[in-house]
Amino acid sequence: MAAQGFLLIATFLLVLMVLARPLGSGLARLINDIPLPGTAGVERILFRLPGVSDHEMNWKQYLCAILGLNMLGLAVLFFMLLGQHYLPLNPQQLPGLSWDLALNTAVSFVTNTNWQSYSGETTLSYFSQMAGLTVQNFLSAASGIAVIFAFIRAFTRQSMSTLGNAWVDLLRITLWVLVPVALLIALFFIQQGAQQNFLPYQAVNTVEGAQQLLPMGPVASQEAIKMLGTNGGGFFNANSSHPFENPTALTNFVQMLAIFLIPTALCFAFGEVTGDRRQGRMLLWAMSVIFVICVGVVMWAEVQGNPHLLALGADSSINMEGKESRFGVLVSSLFAVVTTAASCGAVIAMHDSFTALGGMVPMWLMQIGEVVFGGVGSGLYGMMLFVLLAVFIAGLMIGRTPEYLGKKIDVREMKLTALAILVTPTLVLMGAALAMMTDAGRSAMLNPSPHGFSEVLYAVSSAANNNGSAFAGLSANSPFWNCLLAFCMFVGRFGVIIPVMAIAGSLVSKKSQPASSGTLPTHGPLFVGLLIGTVLLVGALTFIPALALGPVAEYLS
């Protein structure tokens, strides 16, 4: 079993790096504001039609463009879900959503979280899924990538005030990266057996003689961008464990690759754009070390079996509860870590049924800010915040003004970095405390034990860090939970983007200083260790007390 697990992890990472490298080169061209071959004419036409200016923006203008697009998308999706029953492509005549569920769902998909307090096949029409959720899957992913584009430019430009043009970046990211790659993935899913139709639900007779209603719909097209954009919201309630979404072991492997593809490619692009590929490799090493350790822990915990069943004398040599038999323990464990290391949230197994330690690792990966590969764009700018913090700590230890890539890190940047890092832990801890203090919060718990607290902590961690997965024992479709989680998702997304853009605006105006003998190397194993230590230290200090009340207490009981 250990050899199989090692081979699975090694194969996954090897294929990932091979695919991400060329994509990283393409992203580097876009960051450097170089149109891809044959696209310049199309771009000019698309900008001329709506009269959009392609002039460069400062950080405030860039931020306002991103926020404005997302707020418009939020309003459109909210009213679309409310009035779903008036819109076409609704063969099952599904009614509109309640205001609180519509708000939660709209915020969820606009913020790239894709938390779902509903069952897709019994709640949403084809039009809502396709014109509402799938569109936001593209736009939310493009928004995150655009922010990291601007942030990277802050290190490569000197004594400037502009970070690029948000509309140009959004157009190029969507048309030349997300749409083509998602199209290829969708066609592959269809070839493998994923659904793509607009038929009414089909009544069939099962082998037992009973009748069953099979849901239909345009699944493959949504599934592709759901994974590529680290969105994660499933067309069906069972998400990627449903055979209509994820029909074969090969589609499952491609789905895991798609989740990590753009976050990995962005690391390669970062190294290429800064002129020092070692910087990108440093980030990949730090992410990969944490990732491999976490996968190993989850695999070990799940292979041990369920201790409660073992205590009762039942056969539980491995923990198969909540897992698809066609995928098994090792693949389910790998997928769980992939989907929570990135801000995806898609699942092929129920995380609520993992062992105490097996479920704690995905929860902790979200709590440290989704920086281990992370979401498209958001993962890298989240990790870059920890890079700045690590550089600052190192500067304090050696008595020098901290600098990174030649840019001095001053008080303003550190205050904004601390603010951005503290946003999500504050939301998680205060949100969980509020839920446990109120009857409306506690009544949603399936279990009154430490595992019940873990369900609450997982839900708020998932929402605040824009992941979207859940310990599904929590009954979250209530006004209290829909509003609480919507607030956490909204602030967790834009409360980090705003200081990140402010940091970019500050750094882009500075001159780049040449490296000297006292400059801290930020590309070697020493800095990789320092960066990993910084991530672990912040995560440990912030969440160990809360984790001790949930999964740790469950493990020891």
From Swiss-Prot:
It comes from the Bacteria. The keyword Nucleus does not apply. GO terms for molecular function: P-type potassium transmembrane transporter activity; potassium ion binding. It is found in: Cell inner membrane. GO terms for cellular component: plasma membrane. It is a multi-pass membrane protein. Signal peptide: none annotated. The chain crosses the membrane at residues 5-25, 63-83, 132-152, 170-190, 253-273, 283-303, 329-349, 356-376, 379-399, 416-436, 484-504, 526-546. Pfam families: KdpA (PF03814). InterPro entries: KdpA (IPR004623). Its main location: membrane. Keywords: Cell inner membrane, Cell membrane, Ion transport, Membrane, Potassium, Potassium transport, Transmembrane, Transmembrane helix, Transport. The system is composed of three essential subunits: KdpA, KdpB and KdpC. Part of the high-affinity ATP-driven potassium transport (or Kdp) system, which catalyzes the hydrolysis of ATP coupled with the electrogenic transport of potassium into the cytoplasm. This subunit binds the periplasmic potassium ions and delivers the ions to the membrane domain of KdpB through an intramembrane tunnel. Belongs to the KdpA family. This is Potassium-transporting ATPase potassium-binding subunit. It comes from Shigella flexneri. The gene is kdpA.
